[in-house]
Amino acid sequence: MLFNLKNRHLLSLVHHTPQEIQFLLQLAKELKQAKYTGTEQPRLKGKNIALIFEKTSTRTRCSFEVAAYDQGANVTYIDPNSSQIGHKESMKDTARVLGRMYDAIEYRGFKQAVVNELAEYAGVPVFNGLTDEFHPTQMLADVLTMMEHSDKPLSDIIYVYIGDARNNMGNSLLLIGAKLGMDVRICAPKALQPEAELVAMCQEFAQQTGARITITEDVELAVKGVDFVHTDVWVSMGEPLESWGERINLLLPYQVTPALMQRSGNPKVKFMHCLPAFHNCETEVGKKIAEKYPHLANGIEVTEEVFESPMNIAFDQAENRMHTIKAVMVASLA
């Protein structure tokens, strides 16, 4: 089935149909196979792509750059310290300048309104590499990864996101599950559940696709029978360590442990994480946390036992960022 996604933005997946999302996933699968077999054909020769990063990144930057190079495109990396964006020049003006020079723009930053403004004024496709509200390229990678690790049709796959569900991962996993007719469960304390407006929108999508949506504080209910357990960091890197105590106490019952995974009752259950993950105290941040909260020395949102077990497929997710991002660029620019 063919879809024309030429010159389409990727801002949140709200405005993509289920069929368009599945087309991108199938294209990513084909591009991945071509890369593995050495038969990939560069379809973006002569294209120039600007990568705006107001937030630092490993996976997103590398995925966009390698995907672009594989397809013959050129990229320019722009960070806050090497441009006038937001200092002497508005995003609206930046969009109108870069749109004259580049064939597409990627943005990774804070507010969803900023990437929407870029899309409104650039005159070229804009791709959301992450905002506080949504993380669409991660969602495509997550679903591709779940497809690879399950022999079920999408509509039969059951997954749970557990932890702080107010963030871009909680929002986006709820959205794409609703769009694709999946069984999606969001498990978080009441204060950290997705906004009611987003939930209502996803419930409407679910009525059209047959998705099953569960939003609950009950860990037992949420994990029963799931195929995949997703989580993310509990505290943003910008927040001072002193403020972590209340959040940690609130989320400790939602830590992904071997016992939690076993409560799924599924011997094939897999663990997923968009990374980076605080699963030990080997990083600078991990050491500081372990000093202040010794009971978390073996992991914060996920324990070392789960992360280093065969259940963990987070590195497959990380690789699939590249393949799905490549699919987005090829579909929009080729």
Curated annotation (Swiss-Prot):
GO biological process assignments: arginine biosynthetic process via ornithine; arginine catabolic process to ornithine; citrulline biosynthetic process
Statement: the UniProt record of this protein carries the keyword Transferase: yes
Pathway in which this enzyme or protein is active: Amino-acid degradation; L-arginine degradation via ADI pathway; carbamoyl phosphate from L-arginine: step 2/2
Binding-site list for carbamoyl phosphate: S57, T58, R59, T60, Q84, R108, H135, P136, T137, Q138, C274, L275, R321
EC id: 2.1.3.3
Entry GO terms, CC: cytoplasm
Keywords per UniProt: Arginine metabolism, Cytoplasm, Transferase
GO molecular function, one term: amino acid binding
Subcellular location(s) of the protein: Cytoplasm
Keyword Transferase: yes
Function: Reversibly catalyzes the transfer of the carbamoyl group from carbamoyl phosphate (CP) to the N(epsilon) atom of ornithine (ORN) to produce L-citrulline.
PANTHER family, A to Z: ORNITHINE CARBAMOYLTRANSFERASE (PTHR45753:SF2), ORNITHINE CARBAMOYLTRANSFERASE, MITOCHONDRIAL (PTHR45753)
Entry similarity comment: Belongs to the aspartate/ornithine carbamoyltransferase superfamily. OTCase family.
Protein name: Ornithine carbamoyltransferase, catabolic
Encoding gene (name): arcB
